[in-house]
Amino acid sequence: MDEELLPIQYALHPAYPNPFNPITSLRYDLPEQAQVTLAIYDLMGRKVTQLVNTTQEAGYRSVQWNATDMHGKPVSAGVYLYQIRAGEFIQTRKMVLLK
């Protein structure tokens, strides 16, 4: 049997690279199908952009952020938070954009 191994638990991994300029990759694990949202926030808690908002199958996922807001405009250098919500799982991590 050639079954793909699935994650055993939800996880949001550190951004790579971090610090970054101008692109970073955000990886996350889904042990089961879930409604997933992955959003970027500034340190004031304002949503900068939303990268994912869909139902996804179980597996290892990755999405890139190119340091732009929801209107496609470049954001300022600084610290940003990225948060995943998948089912009941919620996790937030920090990343740093250098200019």
Regions picked out by a protein language model, each given a short descriptive name:
Residues 52-87:
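Short, surface-exposed loop/turn motifs with a glycine/proline- and acidic-biased composition
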Residues 54, 95-99:
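Short beta-strand edge segments in extracellular beta-sheet folds
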Residues 89-93:
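Extracellular and select intracellular beta-sandwich modules with Ser/Thr-enriched
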Residues 43-46, 96:
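Helix-terminus/capping and membrane-interface signal
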Residues 42-43, 69:
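Short, acidic, Ser/Thr-enriched surface-loop or helix-capping motifs
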Residues 46-52:
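Surface-exposed loop/edge segments in extracytoplasmic proteins
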Residues 1-16, 20-41, 50, 62-65, ...:
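Glycine-centered coil/turn sites that cap beta-strands in beta-rich domains
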